[in-house]
Amino acid sequence: MNYEKWRHPPVSLVESVKASRAVYKRLGNSGLVVSNPILGGMHIGNPKWNDWVLDEKESIALLKAAYERGVNTWDTANMYSNGESEKIMGKALRVHNIPRSKVVIMTKCCRAVTDPNIEPDIGISTAFYPELSGQSKDYVNHFGLSRASIFQQVEASLQRLNTDYIDVLQIHRFDPEVPPEETMKALHDLVQMNKVRYLGASSMWAHEFAILQHAAEKNNWTKFVSMQNHYSLLYREEEREMIKYCNLTGVGVISWGSLASGRLARPPDQRTVSPRGVNGTIYKDYNPTQSEEIIRRVHQTAVSRGIPMSQVALAWLNKRIVAPVIGLSSVERIDEALDAKAVELSHEEERYLESAYRAQSIQGHA
């Protein structure tokens, strides 16, 4: 047996490592490895849904660029562009011949997806009107976290993604109308059916998340391995309880709103031309004076280091979570986010960035 040829790694493996610019981390106590950063799919879809969304051609090219650089974890939701985000991710895999097993797809269920059979305008979002949807013959059992609605939503997502399984199925929010046991048993059954590999959750109160985890644990069902929180230098309320709970119980934390819709990526006095920046963030800033001061400090730190502001904000996050979900809208933004892995803030810099923050109203749980 000739062992000499095995003394050095294959050239193909070395080249693959060089091309893989992302950092890879385990998602909580699970065995699943995800990339840091995670590509956010809210930007992927149809501009009719929102004017800052990339169209199909732009999205497919962006997904290819992300994959080639090692960003192999893509986060989306059934409601994003009313399902178009999921469709485009599935199409990108086919168009670029990307093996399904080489990409981690995270999607979400709970919100209503507008039915094209009764509303052909893809720009209309039913997701934000749950009370009205619950009174509609066309939407009952098509949103929320009942067994019936979860199964319906997952089957629809699988078809749009053109895949046999979802790597991480996340519940988009807590559903107080459904018994925790019903929700968790339905999710567990999907894992047993191999339609879902892992379970995750997104923004809710810590006690709600604990109730769901307890329901799964006491019945020996599949538990959540991740929590996707609203979290950034401008919004740190999840540090009160949720992040502590996740760290104590081995749940991997990932963040949405990581750069606060780009506010943490540009100086406070710089006007933005991007539609999302012009039209404002999803949630209201209840303390703009505080936010402007934090943004000023991020800018000052970035200038002193000679790096983009986004890398300062992401370096702060990367030390505290598994990975940030980022709406990467261009190849330049992908490269910028990937280079944040080389930035390590000092204790003094962290204190400087954090000290202007004061507690604020909870946002993003509904």
Swiss-Prot record:
GO terms for molecular function: oxidoreductase activity. Coiled coil: none annotated. Substrate binds at H172. The active site is at Y80 (proton donor). SUPFAM superfamilies: NAD(P)-linked oxidoreductase (SSF51430). Keywords: NADP, Oxidoreductase, Virulence. Pathway: Mycotoxin biosynthesis. NADP(+) binds at residues 75, 202-203, 228, 257-267, 329-337. InterPro entries: AKR_Detox_Biosynth, NADP_OxRdtase_dom, NADP_OxRdtase_dom_sf. Gene3D superfamilies: NADP-dependent oxidoreductase domain. CDD domains: AKR_EcYajO-like. Pfam families: Aldo_ket_red. Aldo-keto reductase; part of the gene clusters that mediate the biosynthesis of the host-selective toxins (HSTs) AF-toxins responsible for Alternaria black spot of strawberry disease by the strawberry pathotype. AF-toxin I and III are valine derivatives of 2,3-dyhydroxy-isovaleric acid and 2-hydroxy-isovaleric acid respectively, while AF II is an isoleucine derivative of 2-hydroxy-valeric acid. These derivatives are bound to a 9,10-epoxy-8-hydroxy-9-methyl-decatrienoic acid (EDA) moiety. This is Aldo-keto reductase AFTS1. The lineage of its organism: Eukaryota, Fungi, Dikarya, Ascomycota, Pezizomycotina.
